[in-house]
Amino acid sequence: MPRKRKKTHVLIFLAFYQTIWKLFSNFDPRHATPPATNVTIVVIQRNILYNNESTMNTKIKKTLLTVGLSSSVMLSMAQTPSATATTTNPLLIPSTLSYGAPDFNRIKASDYLPALEAAIAQQRKAINAIAESKQTPTFRNTILAYENSGKLLDRVSSIFFCVDEADKTPEIAATEKAIMPQLTQLDNDISFNEKLFHRVKYVYDHEFAKLKGEDRRLLEEIYKGFVRNGALLSKEKKTRVEQINKRISDLQQQWGTQLQEATNNAVVWVNSKEELAGLSDADIAQCEKDAQSRGAKAPYAIVIINTTQQPILTNLDNRDLRRRVYEASVHRSDGTGRYNTLPIVVEMAKLRAEKGEIMGYHNYAAYSLEKTMAQTPENVYTFLNNLIKAYRPNADKETAAIEAYARQTMGPDFQLQPYDRFYYSAKMKKAQLNLSEDEVKPYFNIDSVQVNGVFYAAHRVYGLNFKERKDLPTYHADMKVFEVSDSTGKPIALFYSDYFRRPTKRGGAWMSSFAKQSKAWNQLPIIYNVCNFAQAPEGQPSYLTWDEVTTMFHEFGHALHGILSNCQYNTLSGTAVPRDFVEMPSQFNESFASIPEIFNHYAINSRGEHMPEALKAKMMESINFQPCYALGENLAATCADMAWAMLPSSAIPTATQATTFEQESLKKVGLLDSQIPPRYFTSYFNHVWGGGYAAGYYSYLWTEVLADNIAMTFKQKGALKRTTGDEFRDKILSRGYTVDLMKAFSSFTGLQQPDAQALLKMRGL
């Protein structure tokens, strides 16, 4: 959930406020003013990194991390001037909290829209001042001024979009609908501001060769960002791109709202406890709680999560109920009426294809991939085809084995259906390994996993320490806040965790930030993770499945990428890297969950007992039990994404043809398999249609290869050695996008190119 991007083309910098900034330039983060806050943008691309379990992170819209890649950020509250000297809006005045943390005790839903509009107005003024300047353009008066503009808007929007994703009430949704067109217009106005671009180009032409290090990188990213956004196009083409950007923004906002409503509406109501046979008492209690929170149309409710398959099917004995749950998931938003998202899909696909063509590319995929490590669609397909070749025969064997096992109890004519797979796979695992989820789950208390697992691993590897800050307010009572310090005790960041699901939170898991690290701004990071774990009834401890344990480690890997950043400029810091690199730190961090010394430290039951060695051995053996499903669902989703992005604008199917197109596309690559469907079907593929992963979902597999190579290098050098962690931190995690990422990868691993065999080996294939 790498929340993971286009940069904020806007930043506010008025000379009058330089004095204010200086007043706070030497702050003590423990007591006063803070670092900045990150936002999201494409206009405002939300800088959110999604977990594969999510639906991530955000672009003008909700794009997590987008094609253009640099994420925007904002200065800390204390460093950010208010829009007016007399305002009482808490979003427009400096925070007095540690690190400049958002003061959620004072912020009301009604504050967001006026604050956003005031910040937009201020940003326009700052950009116009740069564009209309009569001074000869220089790195300082143009590039740094541009980098420093928009701090107020970044601050306000980062807070708003966090709440918009995690606690979307009707009033918040209305604010999003009202503000997105204004943000899109602002982004377009900046992208196509000819005077501004001429100044940027002048600096690029006259100073690029003279600059070094991060200064040179910053200039290059800003200049190329303008070019990729259409600054060199004719006036007619600029106008059309502007129209496309506006329409896509509207469609993504509509998509997000509609999909959340569709998913909430897809709840499966259950009339009796007997129908829930097979579920644990805790799961049944959760179904009862979910029913009460959704109007209690029946005593129990099964809530649909964002992915195609639903984890609850693993233990649900009632086959007809399993079918109902699966069909509710698959068809949540592909029917007729208000929840059908396919008309949005086809319109957005056509607009993206047209934009790619206007920019001079054959399709949107070619345009989108140019700024990534993969670079071209051909390279992506070569990568995918090699994986499919190894995967396909193993997948067929895996499915046949599960069906054969089911027929032992159900009879020789039993036909395995997709809603049966998790159920019989789990029974087969228990029979072969004598292991069930119910045996291991009591050892994964959510607090222990976080403190004794996730935090402990970061302490062992990077020397980090964590102290809960109960004095800092949050936007929801379920959240926790931690101050992060290094091995010397020096505070370096704040970390917020929001782990439990609720009706107002969209599905999935992600990372983003209220503030990104920047030495130029004397700014420390304020990072957050959001997940959707089930919460136990009040007064009882909550427990995680193994998949959820790895999700927590995954999202904290993104968080570490932000926490350990050590860059000059906020545009280049932290997770502001191509999306096919940004998922590497998160996927790599998952590997610590199963390292014995870490595992033994957090896998403890309510009696304080560690997981028995025999049970632990079986659980570790089960991690790669039947590995094809997880790989196959990702391959299928990736190929569906690429199929849409490869189409020219003249070949986009209609809404009624969309499902057939998806099936035919999967059939062409050997992935049309009812037993292993895509992780997300098109109609609810939020990464692609609501986020920034169009032509980019391959990034999860691509970065898994990088992560597996990194993990093997750690194993060789000493997985828990501080020297290994410090080297990884210095060469990769702290560097943001200030270095050549392939060179950084090679420097740490000693490999000239990533070795894809590592992925197959780690998955047991």
PLM regions with names:
Residues 21, 80-287, 714:
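N-terminal helix-rich structural modules
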Residues 57-65:
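Bacterial N-terminal signal peptides that target proteins for export
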Residues 83-106, 118, 299-301, 431-433, ...:
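C-terminal, non-catalytic "cap/extension" segments appended to globular domains
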Residues 96-111, 160-179, 201-243, 303-343, ...:
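Short His/Asp/Glu-rich catalytic/ion-coordination signatures at enzyme active sites or charged loops
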Residues 534-552:
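Short pre-active-site segment immediately N-terminal to the catalytic Zn-binding motif
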